[in-house]
């Protein structure tokens, strides 16, 4: 779903966004939150997406005015182990994409300890962020460091990289 010309100079997959899909557990009830609304990824070049667990209905849609139904341009089920790669103007600039829903039929759950959450699907999205936009934790503004510190501290418990990033920060 992309051409060689869609690869910017210096392109390489240097970041990974990990999304957990499943249900919030509140008062003994499961509230399904396994979806992502329509959006565009603005990083240059193709995006590679690896899906694990329950299958998800992935759609490309046209933008519309609020209150109107979106037109589905392309859709596909992303099964356990699926690798999807997309890029180019058609899929990154002219259309939005979304995860419309995640099945429960396979009975997949992950033994991941996130308080109040049951994970049925994990998605790893790899993309290229130009080097000039990658900022070390120590060089973030004081406010940005404060906002992200708790998360980085949690990551540092199991990662030498994040432990070093915390140590280097003022």
Annotate each language-model stretch with its function.
Residues 4, 25-26, 112:
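Nucleic-acid-interacting cores, centered on viral/eukaryotic replication and modification enzymes
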Residues 7:
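Core nucleotidyl-transferase/polymerase catalytic module
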Residues 12-95:
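Catalytic core of non-heme Fe(II) oxygenases with the double-stranded beta-helix
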Residues 61-170:
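Catalytic core of Fe(II)/2-oxoglutarate
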């Amino acid at each position: 779903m992309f051409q060689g010309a869609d690869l910017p100079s210096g392109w390489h997959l240097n970041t990974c966004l990990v999304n957990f899909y499943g249900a919030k557990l509140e008062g003994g009830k499961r509230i399904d939150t396994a979806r992502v609304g329509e959006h565009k990824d603005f990083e240059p070049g193709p995006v590679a997406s690896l899906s694990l667990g329950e299958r998800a209905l992935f759609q490309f849609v046209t933008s519309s005015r609020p209150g109107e139904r979106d037109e589905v341009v392309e859709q596909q089920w992303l099964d356990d182990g699926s690798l999807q790669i997309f890029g180019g103007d058609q899929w990154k600039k002219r259309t939005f994409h979304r995860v419309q829903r995640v099945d429960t039929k396979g009975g997949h759950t992950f033994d991941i300890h996130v308080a109040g959450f049951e994970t049925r699907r994990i998605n790893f999205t790899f993309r290229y962020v130009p080097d000039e936009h990658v900022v070390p934790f120590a060089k973030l503004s004081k406010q940005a460091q404060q906002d992200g510190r708790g998360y980085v501290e949690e990551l540092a418990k199991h990662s030498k990289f994040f432990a070093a990033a915390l140590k280097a920060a003022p």
